[in-house]
Amino acid sequence: VMATKIPFIYEYEYSYGALEELTPLIRRVTAPNPSGFTFHGTGTYIIGRGNVAVVDPGPLIEEHVKALENLLQGETVTHILITHTHADHSPAAAPLKKVWGTKTYGYGPHGAGKIEPGAQIEAGGDMEFIPDVEVRDGDIIEGDGWTVECVYTPGHTSNHICFSLKEENALFTGDHVMGWSTSVIGPPDGDMTSYISSLEKLLLRDDEIYWPTHGTCITDVKNFVQAFIDHRLDRER
């Protein structure tokens, strides 16, 4: 059997602490936390103009938090959306909440999608984060000039959610689908069966572009997701 080749994308234009204009409704600030898990760092996305949502505020690095505060001066963060509770995604929600008095939205605390104990205490998990608003699959979040649908995608973590920006047919994929690497699926909280089901779920959607929290956007979304599924099934055989 030929192993499936995933068409990885390694280009990534960024500079730390700068506000990149990506599309009419999407901007991004990259945190200075490069690693083997985060690629060049956590890409914190800003949806909208004026009254905005922040997707995955990122790690608790003062430089990054200050950059977000400074770059968004004159704007108001009305929503903070968390794809999942890992230390490179959710902790910066706490200081940003203080600045703007914003509510956070997520599936639940770490291990929320799991029954057995153990998932709640794994390394790399953000155990502090509890969303102000718990969202479920299909929930709609209405902002000022933007609309987001919640897409529950357990696998990488049991509480992983993608956020679909309706106005641009775009999906913020967190760590569920990345362009430069496959996801780490580590038990007890990660689950391979859920992960493959969540990938198959994306194939049924009509999103045209993916914005992962690490690395650049993915435009050939269906083929990309199918390659991920095939790659995992090759390995499981």
Per-region residue spans from a language model:
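C-terminal regulatory/interaction regions
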Residues: 3-8, 237
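Short, structured coil segments at secondary-structure junctions
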Residues: 22, 99-100, 206
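Residues at the C-termini of beta-strands that transition into short coil/loop
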Residues: 30-32, 81, 108, 214
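Glycine-rich, phosphate-binding/catalytic loops in enzymes
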Residues: 45-46, 70-73, 97-99, 189-190, ...
